[in-house]
UniProtKB/Swiss-Prot annotation:
This protein's record includes keyword DNA-binding: yes
Protein name: RNA polymerase sigma factor RpoH
Organism: Citrobacter freundii
Record's GO cellular component terms: cytoplasm
Gene3D superfamilies according to UniProt: 1.20.120.1810, 1.20.140.160
Highest taxon above the source species: Bacteria
Keyword annotations of the record: Cytoplasm, DNA-binding, Sigma factor, Stress response, Transcription, Transcription regulation
GO biological process: DNA-templated transcription initiation; response to heat
Length: 284
Protein backbone atom coordinates (compact mmCIF):
# COMPACT_ATOMS: atom_id res chain seq x y z
CA UNK A 1 0.00 0.00 0.00
CA UNK A 2 1.42 3.38 -0.93
CA UNK A 3 1.94 6.11 1.65
CA UNK A 4 -0.70 8.29 -0.01
CA UNK A 5 -3.27 5.49 0.19
CA UNK A 6 -2.37 4.81 3.83
CA UNK A 7 -2.90 8.46 4.69
CA UNK A 8 -6.32 8.39 3.08
CA UNK A 9 -7.27 5.24 5.00
CA UNK A 10 -6.07 6.60 8.33
CA UNK A 11 -7.65 10.04 7.97
CA UNK A 12 -9.45 11.00 11.22
CA UNK A 13 -13.14 10.22 11.16
CA UNK A 14 -13.96 13.33 13.21
CA UNK A 15 -17.60 14.05 14.07
CA UNK A 16 -19.37 10.77 13.41
CA UNK A 17 -22.70 12.14 12.21
CA UNK A 18 -21.01 14.56 9.83
CA UNK A 19 -18.74 11.81 8.57
CA UNK A 20 -21.64 9.46 7.86
CA UNK A 21 -23.53 12.20 6.02
CA UNK A 22 -20.45 12.90 3.93
CA UNK A 23 -19.93 9.20 3.21
CA UNK A 24 -23.54 8.77 2.11
CA UNK A 25 -23.32 11.88 -0.07
CA UNK A 26 -20.75 10.31 -2.36
CA UNK A 27 -22.54 8.88 -5.41
CA UNK A 28 -22.44 5.14 -5.93
CA UNK A 29 -20.63 3.97 -9.04
CA UNK A 30 -22.19 2.06 -11.88
CA UNK A 31 -20.54 -1.21 -12.89
CA UNK A 32 -18.95 0.46 -15.91
CA UNK A 33 -17.66 3.43 -13.90
CA UNK A 34 -16.23 1.14 -11.26
CA UNK A 35 -14.49 -1.06 -13.80
CA UNK A 36 -12.96 1.92 -15.61
CA UNK A 37 -11.54 3.30 -12.36
CA UNK A 38 -10.33 -0.12 -11.23
CA UNK A 39 -8.50 -0.59 -14.53
CA UNK A 40 -6.79 2.80 -14.14
CA UNK A 41 -5.61 1.82 -10.68
CA UNK A 42 -4.66 -1.75 -11.54
CA UNK A 43 -2.79 -1.04 -14.76
CA UNK A 44 -1.60 2.55 -14.29
CA UNK A 45 -1.37 3.00 -10.52
CA UNK A 46 -3.77 5.96 -10.74
CA UNK A 47 -4.25 7.22 -7.16
CA UNK A 48 -7.10 9.54 -8.12
CA UNK A 49 -8.98 6.48 -9.36
CA UNK A 50 -8.20 4.73 -6.07
CA UNK A 51 -9.49 7.73 -4.12
CA UNK A 52 -12.79 7.74 -6.01
CA UNK A 53 -13.22 3.99 -5.51
CA UNK A 54 -12.61 4.37 -1.79
CA UNK A 55 -14.83 7.40 -1.23
CA UNK A 56 -17.73 5.86 -3.14
CA UNK A 57 -17.59 2.78 -0.88
CA UNK A 58 -17.25 4.45 2.54
CA UNK A 59 -20.99 4.02 3.14
CA UNK A 60 -20.55 0.25 3.04
CA UNK A 61 -17.86 0.39 5.73
CA UNK A 62 -20.36 2.23 7.93
CA UNK A 63 -22.94 -0.53 7.33
CA UNK A 64 -20.44 -3.22 8.30
CA UNK A 65 -19.18 -1.33 11.37
CA UNK A 66 -22.71 -0.94 12.74
CA UNK A 67 -22.90 -4.71 13.09
CA UNK A 68 -20.20 -4.54 15.78
CA UNK A 69 -21.82 -1.87 17.94
CA UNK A 70 -22.54 -4.36 20.73
CA UNK A 71 -18.91 -4.69 21.77
CA UNK A 72 -18.79 -1.32 23.49
CA UNK A 73 -16.13 0.15 21.21
CA UNK A 74 -16.36 3.59 19.62
CA UNK A 75 -18.22 3.49 16.32
CA UNK A 76 -15.76 5.96 14.83
CA UNK A 77 -12.86 3.64 15.63
CA UNK A 78 -14.65 0.65 14.11
CA UNK A 79 -15.31 2.63 10.95
CA UNK A 80 -11.72 3.79 10.77
CA UNK A 81 -10.49 0.19 11.02
CA UNK A 82 -13.00 -0.82 8.36
CA UNK A 83 -11.63 1.92 6.13
CA UNK A 84 -8.20 0.33 6.39
CA UNK A 85 -9.73 -2.93 5.20
CA UNK A 86 -11.39 -1.09 2.32
CA UNK A 87 -8.04 0.41 1.34
CA UNK A 88 -6.41 -3.02 1.31
CA UNK A 89 -9.24 -4.39 -0.80
CA UNK A 90 -9.01 -1.56 -3.35
CA UNK A 91 -5.27 -2.12 -3.65
CA UNK A 92 -5.78 -5.85 -4.31
CA UNK A 93 -8.90 -5.59 -6.47
CA UNK A 94 -8.48 -6.92 -10.00
CA UNK A 95 -11.13 -5.72 -12.47
CA UNK A 96 -10.61 -8.83 -14.61
CA UNK A 97 -12.16 -11.11 -11.98
CA UNK A 98 -15.62 -9.89 -12.95
CA UNK A 99 -17.19 -9.18 -9.53
CA UNK A 100 -18.13 -5.86 -7.98
CA UNK A 101 -15.72 -4.21 -5.58
CA UNK A 102 -18.20 -4.27 -2.68
CA UNK A 103 -18.42 -8.06 -2.87
CA UNK A 104 -14.64 -8.34 -2.81
CA UNK A 105 -14.06 -5.67 -0.17
CA UNK A 106 -16.55 -6.78 2.48
CA UNK A 107 -14.27 -9.62 3.58
CA UNK A 108 -11.29 -7.28 4.01
CA UNK A 109 -13.42 -4.76 5.90
CA UNK A 110 -14.71 -7.41 8.29
CA UNK A 111 -11.23 -8.84 8.82
CA UNK A 112 -9.79 -5.50 9.96
CA UNK A 113 -12.72 -4.82 12.29
CA UNK A 114 -12.50 -8.35 13.72
CA UNK A 115 -8.84 -7.86 14.55
CA UNK A 116 -9.56 -4.49 16.15
CA UNK A 117 -12.34 -5.92 18.32
CA UNK A 118 -10.15 -8.82 19.42
CA UNK A 119 -7.28 -6.48 20.27
CA UNK A 120 -9.35 -3.96 22.20
CA UNK A 121 -12.46 -5.54 23.67
CA UNK A 122 -10.53 -7.02 26.59
CA UNK A 123 -7.11 -6.57 28.09
CA UNK A 124 -6.59 -10.34 27.81
CA UNK A 125 -7.12 -11.51 24.25
CA UNK A 126 -10.15 -13.79 24.40
CA UNK A 127 -9.83 -15.51 21.04
CA UNK A 128 -6.51 -16.82 19.84
CA UNK A 129 -7.42 -19.89 17.78
CA UNK A 130 -9.61 -20.15 14.70
CA UNK A 131 -12.31 -22.02 16.67
CA UNK A 132 -12.24 -19.42 19.43
CA UNK A 133 -12.59 -16.55 16.96
CA UNK A 134 -15.54 -18.28 15.33
CA UNK A 135 -17.19 -18.63 18.74
CA UNK A 136 -16.39 -15.07 19.78
CA UNK A 137 -18.15 -13.50 16.81
CA UNK A 138 -21.09 -15.94 16.73
CA UNK A 139 -21.88 -16.53 20.40
CA UNK A 140 -23.62 -13.18 20.76
CA UNK A 141 -25.89 -14.05 17.83
CA UNK A 142 -27.06 -17.35 19.35
CA UNK A 143 -27.19 -16.40 23.03
CA UNK A 144 -30.84 -16.16 24.09
CA UNK A 145 -30.34 -14.86 27.64
CA UNK A 146 -27.69 -13.04 29.68
CA UNK A 147 -27.14 -15.86 32.18
CA UNK A 148 -25.22 -19.07 31.60
CA UNK A 149 -26.20 -21.54 28.90
CA UNK A 150 -27.79 -24.77 30.07
CA UNK A 151 -26.36 -28.02 28.70
CA UNK A 152 -28.93 -28.29 25.90
CA UNK A 153 -28.10 -24.76 24.74
CA UNK A 154 -24.38 -25.50 24.88
CA UNK A 155 -24.82 -28.59 22.70
CA UNK A 156 -27.08 -26.71 20.27
CA UNK A 157 -24.54 -23.88 19.86
CA UNK A 158 -21.71 -26.38 19.45
CA UNK A 159 -23.59 -28.17 16.66
CA UNK A 160 -24.52 -24.94 14.88
CA UNK A 161 -20.95 -23.59 14.94
CA UNK A 162 -19.16 -26.88 14.38
CA UNK A 163 -17.14 -26.77 17.61
CA UNK A 164 -17.03 -28.82 20.80
CA UNK A 165 -19.21 -28.24 23.87
CA UNK A 166 -16.00 -27.62 25.81
CA UNK A 167 -15.08 -24.78 23.42
CA UNK A 168 -18.49 -23.16 23.95
CA UNK A 169 -18.21 -23.33 27.75
CA UNK A 170 -14.67 -21.95 27.68
CA UNK A 171 -15.57 -19.01 25.45
CA UNK A 172 -18.71 -18.25 27.46
CA UNK A 173 -16.57 -18.12 30.58
CA UNK A 174 -14.02 -15.83 28.92
CA UNK A 175 -16.68 -13.47 27.64
CA UNK A 176 -18.35 -13.28 31.06
CA UNK A 177 -15.10 -12.63 32.94
CA UNK A 178 -14.52 -9.12 34.31
CA UNK A 179 -11.37 -7.20 33.33
CA UNK A 180 -9.14 -5.46 35.88
CA UNK A 181 -8.07 -1.98 34.79
CA UNK A 182 -4.45 -0.99 35.32
CA UNK A 183 -5.27 2.61 36.34
CA UNK A 184 -8.07 2.77 38.90
CA UNK A 185 -10.28 5.83 38.54
CA UNK A 186 -10.35 8.32 41.39
CA UNK A 187 -14.06 8.74 40.78
CA UNK A 188 -15.97 6.31 42.98
CA UNK A 189 -19.24 6.93 41.18
CA UNK A 190 -20.23 3.57 39.72
CA UNK A 191 -22.22 5.26 36.97
CA UNK A 192 -19.02 6.73 35.59
CA UNK A 193 -17.49 3.29 34.99
CA UNK A 194 -18.10 1.63 31.63
CA UNK A 195 -20.32 -1.43 31.72
CA UNK A 196 -18.85 -4.74 30.59
CA UNK A 197 -19.75 -5.42 26.96
CA UNK A 198 -21.19 -8.80 27.97
CA UNK A 199 -24.11 -6.89 29.56
CA UNK A 200 -25.26 -5.53 26.23
CA UNK A 201 -23.99 -7.96 23.62
CA UNK A 202 -27.51 -8.39 22.27
CA UNK A 203 -27.52 -5.21 20.20
CA UNK A 204 -30.95 -4.82 18.61
CA UNK A 205 -30.25 -1.49 16.93
CA UNK A 206 -27.60 -2.88 14.60
CA UNK A 207 -28.77 -4.81 11.58
CA UNK A 208 -26.29 -5.46 8.83
CA UNK A 209 -29.18 -6.76 6.71
CA UNK A 210 -30.24 -3.13 6.33
CA UNK A 211 -26.91 -2.45 4.63
CA UNK A 212 -25.02 -4.56 2.15
CA UNK A 213 -27.05 -7.72 2.63
CA UNK A 214 -30.28 -5.81 2.05
CA UNK A 215 -29.11 -5.04 -1.46
CA UNK A 216 -28.06 -8.69 -1.84
CA UNK A 217 -25.01 -7.65 -3.82
CA UNK A 218 -22.59 -10.05 -2.23
CA UNK A 219 -24.82 -13.12 -2.50
CA UNK A 220 -25.83 -12.22 -6.04
CA UNK A 221 -22.24 -11.85 -7.20
CA UNK A 222 -21.15 -15.03 -5.44
CA UNK A 223 -24.00 -17.04 -6.97
CA UNK A 224 -23.27 -15.72 -10.44
CA UNK A 225 -19.59 -16.56 -10.08
CA UNK A 226 -20.41 -20.07 -8.86
CA UNK A 227 -22.75 -20.76 -11.77
CA UNK A 228 -20.30 -19.25 -14.23
CA UNK A 229 -17.49 -21.47 -12.91
CA UNK A 230 -19.69 -24.53 -13.33
CA UNK A 231 -19.94 -23.72 -17.03
CA UNK A 232 -16.18 -24.09 -17.51
CA UNK A 233 -14.34 -27.31 -18.21
CA UNK A 234 -12.43 -28.88 -15.32
CA UNK A 235 -9.02 -27.64 -16.44
CA UNK A 236 -10.22 -24.07 -16.89
CA UNK A 237 -11.85 -24.16 -13.45
CA UNK A 238 -8.58 -25.32 -11.93
CA UNK A 239 -6.63 -22.56 -13.67
CA UNK A 240 -9.03 -19.84 -12.48
CA UNK A 241 -9.00 -21.12 -8.90
CA UNK A 242 -5.22 -21.43 -8.85
CA UNK A 243 -4.62 -18.03 -10.45
CA UNK A 244 -7.39 -15.91 -8.91
CA UNK A 245 -9.33 -17.53 -6.08
CA UNK A 246 -6.67 -19.19 -3.93
CA UNK A 247 -5.46 -16.09 -2.07
CA UNK A 248 -2.95 -17.96 0.10
CA UNK A 249 -1.30 -20.12 -2.56
CA UNK A 250 -1.62 -18.63 -6.03
CA UNK A 251 0.04 -20.56 -8.86
CA UNK A 252 2.23 -19.11 -11.58
CA UNK A 253 1.64 -19.74 -15.27
CA UNK A 254 4.72 -21.95 -15.35
CA UNK A 255 3.55 -24.05 -12.39
CA UNK A 256 0.25 -24.71 -14.15
CA UNK A 257 2.05 -25.37 -17.41
CA UNK A 258 4.14 -28.05 -15.69
CA UNK A 259 1.04 -29.54 -14.12
CA UNK A 260 -0.79 -29.91 -17.43
CA UNK A 261 2.20 -30.57 -19.67
CA UNK A 262 1.65 -27.53 -21.88
CA UNK A 263 3.42 -24.21 -22.40
CA UNK A 264 2.96 -21.21 -20.13
CA UNK A 265 1.57 -19.32 -23.12
CA UNK A 266 -1.08 -22.00 -23.58
CA UNK A 267 -2.09 -21.65 -19.92
CA UNK A 268 -2.32 -17.88 -20.39
CA UNK A 269 -4.63 -18.38 -23.39
CA UNK A 270 -6.81 -20.81 -21.43
CA UNK A 271 -6.95 -18.35 -18.55
CA UNK A 272 -7.91 -15.48 -20.85
CA UNK A 273 -10.66 -17.51 -22.52
CA UNK A 274 -12.01 -18.66 -19.17
CA UNK A 275 -12.08 -15.10 -17.82
CA UNK A 276 -13.94 -13.97 -20.93
CA UNK A 277 -16.58 -16.67 -20.39
CA UNK A 278 -16.92 -15.77 -16.71
CA UNK A 279 -17.43 -12.08 -17.47
CA UNK A 280 -20.06 -12.88 -20.09
CA UNK A 281 -21.93 -15.18 -17.71
CA UNK A 282 -21.79 -12.74 -14.79
CA UNK A 283 -22.89 -9.74 -16.87
CA UNK A 284 -25.72 -11.65 -18.55
Amino acid sequence: MTKEMQNLALAPVGNLESYIRAANAWPMLSADEERALAEKLHYQGDLEAAKTLILSHLRFVVHVARNYAGYGLRQADLIQEGNIGLMKAVRRFNPEVGVRLVSFAVHWIKAEIHEYVLRNWRIVKVATTKAQRKLFFNLRKTKQRLGWFNQDEVEMVARELGVSSKDVREMESRMAAQDMTFDMSSDDESDSQPMAPVLYLQDKSSNFADGIEEDNWEDQAANKLTHAMEGLDERSQDIIRARWLDEDNKSTLQELADRYGVSAERVRQLEKNAMKKLRAAIEA
